[in-house]
């Protein structure tokens, strides 16, 4: 939820689509893991994580090396009790994962440019694919996912009230309370 996490809805949806094959991948179907979240990530603890800490799903996966070559490995992925837990854990990870003393995805929360947001995710080490940024941007553009991004509030969320120290009678208080 963009309003809760500050992560663009278009970016989260594009990752969901890419990482889970529109929710139809083996990992999404058998483990409710729609974002390719491995069991071992950044120390495994961050505020709001939604994984139970021990349920895993092992499967072969492809990793791309920096030279562009591919290698097949067997990896343990997080297994969730629901897709909702997968979505919540993904957001919590992007907001709270650390790389030493720095946030791994610093600047992602509140970023309003999807191209910059997906670059932050790639630069933080989320995926090994050299084409990850281009693939996410293509999905966002192909499906016009930016239409789901919440508009940034342009009006203050607090209201100011003029308060009198002394009220002569109840009638003079009319309109002072909501």
Positions of predicted regions on the chain:
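Catalytic cores of secreted/periplasmic lytic hydrolases that degrade extracellular macromolecules
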Residues: 1-156
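Beta-loop motif signature
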Residues: 157-178
């Amino acid at each position: 939820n963009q309003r809760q996490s500050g992560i663009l809805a278009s970016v989260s949806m594009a990752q969901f689509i890419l990482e889970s094959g529109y929710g139809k991948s083996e990992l999404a179907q058998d483990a409710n893991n729609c974002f390719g979240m491995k069991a071992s990530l950044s120390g495994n603890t961050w505020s709001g994580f939604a994984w139970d800490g021990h349920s895993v799903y092992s499967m072969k996966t492809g990793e791309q090396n920096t030279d562009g070559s591919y290698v097949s490995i067997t990896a343990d992925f997080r297994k969730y009790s629901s897709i909702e837990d997968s979505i919540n854990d993904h957001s919590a990870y992007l907001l709270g994962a650390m790389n030493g003393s720095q946030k791994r995805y610093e600047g992602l929360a509140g970023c309003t440019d999807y191209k910059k947001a997906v670059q932050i995710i790639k630069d933080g080490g989320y995926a090994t694919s050299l084409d990850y940024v281009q693939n996410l941007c293509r999905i966002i553009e192909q499906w016009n996912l930016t239409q789901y991004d919440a508009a940034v509030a342009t009006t203050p969320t607090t209201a100011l009230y003029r308060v009198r120290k002394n009220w002569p009678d109840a009638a003079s208080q009319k309109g002072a309370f909501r």
